[in-house]
Amino acid sequence: MGIVCSILTTTLAFANNAQFIAKDHIVIDLQSGVEWLRCSVGQRWDGAQCVGEIVKLNQEMSIQAIKLANEQLGGNWRLPTREELENIVCQECSRPKIDASIFPNTPAEPFWTGEQNQYSPRHIWSVNFFTGHTYGRFMPFQDLVIRLVRDR
């Protein structure tokens, strides 16, 4: 498993709602004060879009992916909180429920958060970009898509 982000050119993109500023493989979330990897784990930024095969991981494997991202990209990458991931949902967008100009080629599927469901501690919260809704029903051994985030 490898996480690769290629930076070919410096480009800036601004979302219509001015919540996000995208620069190469990083997206700055002005509302949450965090930086997102523009691509899902398994994909890489080619200067114009996210390319490659998305890798679905369970919670244990996501720890290894985070270590690898920190080695390759530097910084303190992590799984997002439920609230952070909910903040990038675009309810006005068609499926996937995310701004594709900022987060291209995002699958319309559930994404892991790093947050345990306090009402059902065996489950982890996820945000589904097919529906735009949050669910606290996935078990840690299930494989879901992940997008990494770090504090600014």
Language model: regions and residue ranges:
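Glycine-aromatic-enriched surface loops/turns that form tight recognition elements
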Residues: 2-78, 82-152
